[in-house]
Amino acid sequence: MKTSAYNVYLGVVAAMLALLFVTINAAPMEADDETAENTLVAHPDGDMELSGPWDAINTAALRKLLLQLDAEDRMGGVTRSWPQAEPRGWGLRALDSRLARQWRADKRQVRFRQCYFNPISCFRK
C-alpha cells in the first residue's frame, strides 16, 4: 500500500517537473535586438549640456498640458453632472441678436434627473 502511494507521488512530482521544463523552454525569450533597444543609454557629455534647457522647457510644457487636461476633465464632469444655465454674455448670440437655444437633450436630461430623484413631481395630472 505504501509503495503504490509512493509511486503515485513520484509520478505526480515527475509530471510537474516535466511540465515546468516544457513551459520554461517554450516561453518566448527576448532577442538580443530587443534587449539592446530596451536598455537605457547614457548621454554623452556634449549632449547633456545642450539638452538641459530643453528638458526644463519640455517639463514646463508637459506640466501646463496636464493642468489643462485636468481642468477640462473637471469642467466636463461638472457639465455632465448637472446642466448649466445659459450664459449671459454675447458668446452664444445668433446673428439676429437672439440667444441661441440649448439642445433639447438638455431639457430631457433635466426632466430625467428630476423624475429620478423626485418621482412624485413627475406624475402628470
Curated annotation (Swiss-Prot):
Record key words, sorted: Cleavage on pair of basic residues, Neuropeptide, Pyrrolidone carboxylic acid, Secreted, Signal
Entry annotated with the keyword Secreted: yes
Locations listed in the record: Secreted
Propeptide stretch(es), residue numbers: 27-106
Keyword Signal part of the UniProt annotation: yes
Sequence positions bearing Pyrrolidone carboxylic acid: Q109
Record's GO cellular component terms: extracellular region
GO molecular function ontology, one term from the record: neuropeptide hormone activity
Family membership: Belongs to the allatostatin family.
Protein name as annotated: Allatostatin
Native source species: Spodoptera frugiperda
